[in-house]
From Swiss-Prot:
One of its GO terms (molecular function) is ATP binding. Gene3D superfamilies: P-loop containing nucleotide triphosphate hydrolases. It comes from Methylococcus capsulatus (strain ATCC 33009 / NCIMB 11132 / Bath). Pfam families: ABC_tran. This is Phosphate import ATP-binding protein PstB. CDD domains: ABC_PstB_phosphate_transporter. It is a peripheral membrane protein. The gene is pstB. The keyword Kinase does not apply. Its main location: membrane. It catalyses: phosphate(out) + ATP + H2O = ADP + 2 phosphate(in) + H(+). It is found in: Cell inner membrane.
Length: 247
């Protein structure tokens, strides 16, 4: 639940008074022209913007009733609870196994080697990658194809049992076949997680999301059921973007 969220980069007002609710076990797509603020807003949801010098966030973002911007909040467990999959696959310089096992190890989620192995296997299965790598778990994660690396990053994210998964253009560096696999995976993961995805592809937003939010110049212009946003947008700016009159 986000209320009156504003983001400043120095003097630049990048996100302006955005309020948005995200439902449990739904996929919400954030769309809009380049530079409209959708990725900046996404990064607010697990405080990734904290790493940017000069960035300031105001307003309220609540998860399980707690404002994630409370001064005393530890961001390490927050970023396990709200995982992130980036635009470019970024596996650790470790084996496939260690890429997935690393998070559960540092968060103390496994009490034995057998339990850790179970987490690794179940995470790779949920990411649709187990059958492709089960005999090569000792190989470097970087040895996989781009699409496999992105699914490995998704497995790494879900290995720490998040509630929410944030995806920032997860398919932009992938070919159509790899993209189709990721989209199918997103649909399957919705049964277990809430997902917010930034995408430049309106076709992808239409395929994978239940709701769509349209951003323009740092403002949330419209949010609604995906079918409604694409077929009967309420705001002229949304209609102009959907129909290709600008963007």
């Amino acid at each position: 639940m986000c209320r009156d969220v504003n983001v400043y980069y120095g003097e630049k007002h990048a996100i302006q008074n955005v309020s948005l609710d995200v439902g449990h076990n739904e996929v919400i797509a954030l769309i809009g022209p380049s530079g409209c603020g959708k990725s900046t807003f996404l990064r607010c949801l697990n405080r990734m913007n904290d790493t940017i010098v000069g960035c300031r966030v105001t307003g309220s973002i609540r998860l399980d009733g707690q404002d994630i911007y409370d001064g005393g909040l530890d961001v390490v467990p927050l970023r396990a609870q709200v995982g992130m999959v980036f635009q470019k696959p970024n596996p650790f310089p470790k084996s496939i196994y260690e890429n997935v096992a690393y998070g559960p190890k540092i968060h103390g989620l496994a009490n034995s080697k057998a339990e850790l192995e179970e987490i690794v296997e179940s995470s790779l299965r949920r990411a649709g990658l187990w059958d492709e790598v089960k005999d090569d778990l000792a190989k470097p994660g970087t040895s996989l194809s781009g699409g496999q690396q992105q699914r490995l990053c998704i497995a790494r994210t879900i290995a720490v049992s998040p509630e929410v998964i944030l995806m920032d253009e997860p398919c932009s560096a992938l070919d159509p076949i790899a993209t189709a696999k990721i989209e199918q995976l997103i649909d399957e993961l919705r049964e277990l997680y809430t997902i917010a995805i930034v995408t430049h592809s309106m076709q992808q937003a239409a395929r994978v999301s239940q709701r769509t939010a349209y951003f323009h110049l740092g403002r949330l212009i419209e949010v609604g059921d995906t079918a409604q946003v694409f077929t009967n947008p309420r705001h002229p700016l949304t209609e102009d973007y959907i129909t290709g009159r600008f963007g």
